[in-house]
Amino acid sequence: MAERFHANSDFWDSDEMTENIPLYEKSVQWRNKTVHPRDSEYVIKEEKYLFLELFSEKFREIIMFLNELPVEMFSCIDLLFYVNGGIYQYLPHKNFVFTWEKNGEKMIKHVSELLSEDLSECIVAIPIFVPIRKILFLGEFGYREAIIDYGRVLSEIMHCWPQAELFRRFENRSMNQKFRLDGIEKSILSIISC
């Protein structure tokens, strides 16, 4: 199985790949610009969005640190944070977050049970792996790239939080169900608490 993955995920310098790489890069910029745009009336009214100044200094520092990283690094990750009792989605290079779940205590209680760790008083990073965003353009090589980017984001978050704890061994199916994810096109592979 591993041999097949390595062989199929190699980079092939083909005409199709040469055409698809710039298309993928444009799709990343397009998504960052059009999904959750800064000038949206919903952002301005703060209906589903909250500006960073409403959060703790620690959370703002984490977001500002992440905002210095390349947008492409987050192209196949929906990065959620449990903070202040809610679950919010990080939006690369923006000064606000999307309200993913207002009442996140119930969900984080389930996560705590799965991890045998009380996370209710922590900031929790929940990176959702969405490899299809790269696979559509780069095929199997895109899947390999997505896995590498997922690991890079985890590494950067761990670097930002010196006392962070990484959880990788948990029942993925139950975790994915709790977050309404199919476990194939979208899944949770790791969680970080601080």
Regions found by a protein language model. Give the residues of each.
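N-terminal accessory segments that position/regulate proteins before the catalytic core
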Residues: 1-194
